[in-house]
């Protein structure tokens, strides 16, 4: 059986660290920023670690 290909959409959106953690960008950043508070915009600049419950689903796609 051939190997499964990595999903290109996921490949563009996440990065796996050397220790195996999955880093993703924050959601809700692309538009409608005038409705968001300064604190929301500032905190969404940081990358976030993928939650363990989501990680189980995405391991099959990576």
UniProtKB/Swiss-Prot annotation:
It holds the Pfam family Ribosomal_L35p. Residues 53-62 have a biased composition (Basic and acidic residues). The keyword Ribonucleoprotein applies. One of its GO terms (molecular function) is structural constituent of ribosome. One of its GO terms (cellular component) is cytosolic large ribosomal subunit. The keyword Transport does not apply. InterPro entries: Ribosomal_bL35, Ribosomal_bL35-like, Ribosomal_bL35_CS, Ribosomal_bL35_sf. One of its GO terms (biological process) is translation. Residues 31-62 are annotated as: Disordered. It comes from the Bacteria. SUPFAM superfamilies: L35p-like. Keywords: Ribonucleoprotein, Ribosomal protein. Gene3D superfamilies: 4.10.410.60. Belongs to the bacterial ribosomal protein bL35 family. This is Large ribosomal subunit protein bL35. The gene is rpmI.
């Amino acid at each position: 059986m051939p190997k499964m290909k990595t999903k290109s959409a996921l490949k563009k959106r996440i990065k796996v660290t050397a220790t195996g953690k999955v880093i993703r960008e924050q959601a809700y950043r692309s538009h409608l920023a005038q409705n968001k508070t300064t604190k929301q915009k500032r905190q969404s600049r940081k990358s976030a670690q993928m939650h363990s419950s989501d990680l189980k689903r995405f391991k099959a796609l990576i």
